[in-house]
Amino acid sequence: MAQRLLLRRFLTSIISGKPSQSRWAPVASRALQTPQYSPGYLTVTPSQARSIYTTRVCSTTFNIQDGPDFQDRVVNSETPVVVDFHAQWCGPCKILGPRLEKVVAKQHGKVVMAKVDIDDHTDLALEYEVSAVPTVLAMKNGDVVDKFVGIKDEDQLEAFLKKLIG
């Protein structure tokens, strides 16, 4: 535990660019000047401690920001899209949303999910004739090919997606 805390403090000081004020700083400094510091299961070399890598995570679920964003990411999408019209105050939406995200994630990119908050985007809700929430549309090549209103269980959602994917 102490080794983890020591390592965390040292790495934090490297990232922030400030020297650590802790009493462990001299120990960490000496330990990491050696080619390799191995306290049990941890192995840190100075070059590893200073490298920070970032990767872009492609998500299968995204929030719609505005009308042009909807046009670009949903209507013009080559991938089939499930559009979840929801509201923050809607209890059933809070149940359906995570279920739908889980089922969409299982499809491994064959379908993506767009989330539209009807309070923020009433124009889209009116355009797609959303009269109750949650409303879920299945869109392919810019056209609505299927729709349902209300909560569904995971089996029904999987069948809904299989029909969309083809």
From Swiss-Prot:
Coiled coil: none annotated. CDD domains: TRX_family. GO terms for molecular function: protein-disulfide reductase activity. PROSITE patterns: THIOREDOXIN_1 (PS00194), THIOREDOXIN_2 (PS51352). Its main location: mitochondrion. GO terms for cellular component: mitochondrion. The modification N6-succinyllysine is found at K152. Residues 1-59 form a transit peptide. Keywords: Acetylation, Disulfide bond, Electron transport, Mitochondrion, Redox-active center, Transit peptide, Transport. The record marks D84 as: Deprotonates C-terminal active site Cys. The modification N6-acetyllysine is found at K152. The record marks G91, P92 as: Contributes to redox potential value. It holds the Pfam family Thioredoxin. It comes from the Eukaryota. Disulfide bonds join C90-C93. InterPro entries: Thioredoxin (IPR005746), Thioredoxin-like_sf (IPR036249), Thioredoxin_CS (IPR017937), Thioredoxin_domain (IPR013766). Residues 61-166 form the Thioredoxin domain. GO terms for biological process: cell redox homeostasis. It is found in: Mitochondrion. The active site is at C90 (nucleophile), C93 (nucleophile). Important for the control of mitochondrial reactive oxygen species homeostasis, apoptosis regulation and cell viability. Is involved in various redox reactions including the reduction of protein disulfide bonds, through the reversible oxidation of its active center dithiol to a disulfide. Belongs to the thioredoxin family. Monomer. This is Thioredoxin, mitochondrial.
